[in-house]
Amino acid sequence: MAIVKCKPTSAGRRHVVKIVNPELHKGKPYAPLLGTKSKTGGRNNLGRITTRHIGGGHKQHYRVIDFKRNKLDIPAVVERLEYDPNRSANIALVLYKDGERRYILAPKGLSAGDQIQSGINAPIKIGNSLPMRNIPVGSTVHNVELKPGKGGQIARSAGAYVQIIAREGNYVTLRLRSGEMRKVLSECVATIGEVGNSEHMLRVLGKAGANRWRGVRPTVRGTAMNPVDHPHGGGEGRNFGKHPVTPWGVQTKGKKTRHNKRTDKYIVRRRGK
């Protein structure tokens, strides 16, 4: 994988930094695993904006990813690595011995031709998926389930991983990249290794249009608006003279956003501490 800085042949190319991976498949994706993906423009069924800064962008197909890894004890071979426009990570097309193909998240170090497997008998090897009670303490994993059988929910983006730091009773303790430590049932399944394409964070789009291709619309500062549009709006100059808030008046600096009290007992240490 190479990090390429473009030559300044135009203003839009001057600052572009691209991530080039020659291992990625250059043809079309595997059609039976594609789904439709409709544009919402950030609107709900009433036509009202519920999420700002969404609209336009290139048409995309959804790739159906196997987050559950529930095809047990059947070996599979990696056919190819592919780009996925719906996520920061790359994906791998795997062919199982019984002839079925599935997409999985491509871990770091996985290449075409490698063999992977799921189940309690799977060896501790990059790309293999098994319950965390069978994974040694200290291992790095990704695509971690929060509930047995629900499919991976933690550590799915490019370069993400979780470390198993303890096992006690029916639970394992995980250390997340954010610094949070939380308990998860040891029956939950995780995949060995970290998610690939960790250089994703180093890319530079270089121009506003590149964000528009991705369906991201401009973000206007509150201080640049009128008082009717934002609590920061109006006044002379750029000072708005109050604590910063969202367009709906909710504090933005340090306000707690977590409301799921039911699972607080599983968090051993909060993030950022």
Swiss-Prot record:
Keywords, alphabetical: Ribonucleoprotein, Ribosomal protein, RNA-binding, rRNA-binding
Q: Which cysteines are joined by disulfide bonds?
A: none
RNA-binding among the record's keywords? yes
Q: Which GO terms describe its cellular component?
A: large ribosomal subunit
An example Gene Ontology molecular-function term: rRNA binding
Purpose: One of the primary rRNA binding proteins. Required for association of the 30S and 50S subunits to form the 70S ribosome, for tRNA binding and peptide bond formation. It has been suggested to have peptidyltransferase activity; this is somewhat controversial. Makes several contacts with the 16S rRNA in the 70S ribosome.
How is the quaternary structure described?
Part of the 50S ribosomal subunit. Forms a bridge to the 30S subunit in the 70S ribosome.
The entry's protein name is Large ribosomal subunit protein uL2
Q: Which organism is it from?
A: Histophilus somni (strain 2336) (Haemophilus somnus)
**What lineage is this protein's organism placed in?**
Bacteria, Pseudomonadati, Pseudomonadota, Gammaproteobacteria, Pasteurellales
| Gene this protein is translated from | rplB
